[in-house]
Amino acid sequence: MRKRFIHILWALLGTGILFCILGFAAVWNGLIGYMPEIEDLQNPINRFATQVYSSDGKVLGTWNLNKENRIVIPYDKMSPHLVEALVATEDERFYEHSGIDFRALGRAIVKRGIMGQANAGGGSTITQQLAKQLYSETASSTVQRFFQKPIEWVIAVKLERYYTKQEIIALYLNYFDFLHNAVGIKTAANTYFNKEPKDLTVCEVATLIGLCKNPSLFNPVRYPDRCRERRNVVLQQMVKAGYMDRSEYAKYSAEPLTLDFHRTDHKDGTATYLREFLRQYMTAKRPVRSDYPSWNRVQFVIDSIAWDTDPLYGWCNKNFKKDGSPYNVYADGLRVFTTIDSRMQKYAEEAVYKHVAGYLQPAFDRENKPKPSAPFSDKLTPNQIRSILNRSVTQSERYRTMKAAGYSPEEIHDAFRKKVEMTVFTYHGDIDTLMSPLDSIRYYKGFLRSGFMSMDPKTGAVKAYVGGLDYTHFMYDMVSLGRRQVGSTIKPFLYSLAMENGFTPCDMAPNRQQTYIVAGRRWTPRNAYHSRYGQMVPLKWGLAQSNNWISAYLMSKLNPQQFVQLLRDYGINNPDIHASMSLCLGPCEVSVSEMVSAYTAFANHGIRTSPLFVSRIEDNEGNTIATFQPRMNEVISADNAMKMLTMLMGVVDQGTAGRLRYRYNMEGQIGAKTGTTNNNSDGWFIGFTPQLVTGCWVGGEDRDIHFDSMSMGQGATMALPIWAIFMKKVYADPTLGFSPMEKFDIPADYNPCASQTEDEFGEEGIDEVFE
């Protein structure tokens, strides 16, 4: 009987072993549960954040989907302490097993399963934990988790076959989610300590490895005391594993928990406006008219031109991977190398902030303080102000959300007028206040906006790009998306057309007010100043003084249709620009990037260079998959470009940009043009040296938000100082290689008036103008 019982036991044991073997084989071959394909095991991490680099090698930021802000780094870029802490804490026999630690597994079964010791530790190896992270869904029950375990064992064994121990460590640390959008050790090190993984201290390493047990439970931001205790447990494990001695433990465990926490967010960092512009630009689809609202026809036309002419526009949907799918900037781990110089970008952001936030905004607030209509012009009626605010309400995210949720117009109206607790932006830091959503819209309209861009006129490389003062609160990009009236900054284009038609800078024109008949209607341009009124003055004087009468006179002698075509050649593609007499004074709306690009023709022998934002793109293995070259077109002849250059240098030396010399002590050769629109709604300044063309716009969100006084609202006050502050910082940095001593390529004996001819001028009165 006893013999038979023993045989039965052996039979049961053998049957159990056989079933285990068969079950293991079934799991191995994917007959039971999910088993990843070999290709998946060989490429277990397939979602990487795209990194955006500056031209000098700095990471400006990343593009990623939620919880996929992962930047993979190799094992040799990790601190040795990081590896030691992980092995000591999570799998002390890591280097001795092949995916499954049977000794630890047996210990866990006895102590946790049989004896019920909750703190006895688990039996999962680092490789098993990696398998769980990569391929197991979150279990909804203990039973489901029980059946997941053998699948993870098989995957762990397979991972050990395909990867070295170092590679498994790297995979684990690169994949783990450390909370706060810090996915992977590189992002975690930057988020919690503002460091690279190889630079982490022992305490910092122990803090991060402590999160591997349960990142939510030991969250260092929410539970610092609990996190510090867990850190010290990791340090104890390192002592136990022989990676440090007791004296070192005593030293490190006594240290406080010190973080340099900064949540990684696409709204933070350097060049935020450029990064968002590039993300949208590269992921754009072929423009379809029906996708654009009726009021945004201009953007449809401009996007269509970009799709046809710019390889970068819609790059992700024009280029495909080996498998035929389009590139995904959120998951493919691309490396986008921009032309931005991180140092110059920093100087540009500082210059914009210093002048707008530090000088203009306080002055604007003082001017508005006694005005009931603030921040709007006191020329507006209450009904007009109400109309502007209501339009902004319907464009707000809150309005769209409430409307989509089915709220009635009356309910939405009441909600926007009910005071609620909110946090609002100030230049001194965010503040908590009680304010209605409608009042908050009006509050934010009181902040002046700005756009700034600097580029190399010969290569097109964009060196600095500032679309606004604070991306979190003012997301609208005033460099590429915003278009405002350009005022007198359009005049160099008009003068260049005159040069192309045989005029010279020394030709004389009547400096007097005249009335023109335009399509049967009388038009009498005004001028801000009356210096040399009634005299015959040279054209170069008219441009230097930004004289409207001289510009109108020139326009009367030229073909407006030809002027519109020339603007197209300069890269100004707004389809709403039509041939008219008043076009000579700049009522058309143009972006900062278009204006800066257009001015490159004056510094580049008549050849306009389009902005070059990206030099190359690499895949996640470092292979170059795209390169980009400057796009150029000849706008005016080299000789006429030199004529324009001499006149625009006169704007600085004897004209409206003279304060560059006497107030900012700017040296060297500089060409420039100021611009101011009606009611001081827009202040422009575009200046260029032989090495850089830089433009700046300052104004309100709406045209009815502006300075009342000309002295404060003109381009020479609003925008010119930003250019000066930026250039002085650039010149002061010897590592950049820019010098005020650089000269324009003009022959020493060049005479811009060599082809001067006699010209007849009409009598003062009314001219009939062709249109």
Predicted ranges, named:
Residues P256, L481-M536, S610-T624:
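Short, glycine/proline-biased beta-turn/loop segments that scaffold the active-site neighborhood
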Residues D245-T339, R343-Y407:
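Non-catalytic structural connector segments
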Residues T125-I126, L134-S136, S141, R145, ...:
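Active-site-adjacent helix/loop patches that line small-molecule binding or acyl-intermediate pockets
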Residues Y95-L105, V183-K186, D245-A250, M499-A519, ...:
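Short, well-structured active-site flanking segments
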Residues A85-V87, M238, A348, T459-G460, ...:
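Active-site SXXK
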Residues W10, N46-A49, Y53-S304, Y313-C316, ...:
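Peptidoglycan glycan-strand catalytic modules in the bacterial/periplasmic cell-wall system
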